[in-house]
Amino acid sequence: LVCSRLLNRPVVQSRQDIRPFHIADYDLHKFDPRDRETQKKFHLYFKNRGIDLSTQYAFHRHFCLATKYDAEETIHTCLAFPLTLPKGDGTVVGFEERDCVRIDGSSNYQDKAEEGNTNEGLWIVSPAQTPLAEAKHVYWFESAYDAMAYYQLHQAQNQELQKAVFVSTGGKPIEKQTRDVLELTIPATQHICFNNNRKGWNFKRELQQEICRTVHSAIEETPERKP
């Protein structure tokens, strides 16, 4: 497992190792824009990332604090970004978990919960609640934190960002994830905002290739050009 990660090889869990995701197994604390008391618990999570309150308001429907007992009956709480399927009905199929903290105060950084459909699920968000299939602009990120930070930096100069759709892959993009989004958003402009490092460059190249494949497969030959 460690060697695979060092060599940037995908780590694939066998189906029997992937635990089913049940949102009812979690105690959820949500951000209410009309109740300052509900907002206070999020302060430390977002303060450390430089995410201001107005940005939290813009994305408040799409994050929460998720608390769950692990196998040793130890409570841990994470900032959770719900994952949904691009072609689904909005049902939450997993979490992109960030900054997990156990009850003893120890922390455990995670990209995604070790359960649920994280191979197909994505964090798919629009501040203006634009449906994915109606998006004119789609912005791709490796984490939900990155997406929120980008919005915060650019929304004053680009009011159209409110209508855009932000997608977080929660790490390495998986072909099934990207293909389902692209098939729904062929007319949209795809903005690739992955990290500016070797992994990010590789992710960008893979997504560009998938964009080309998706667009090419959608082109229908005219009768004059068909063999």
Give a label for each model feature:
Residues Q152-P227:
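TOPRIM fold recognition
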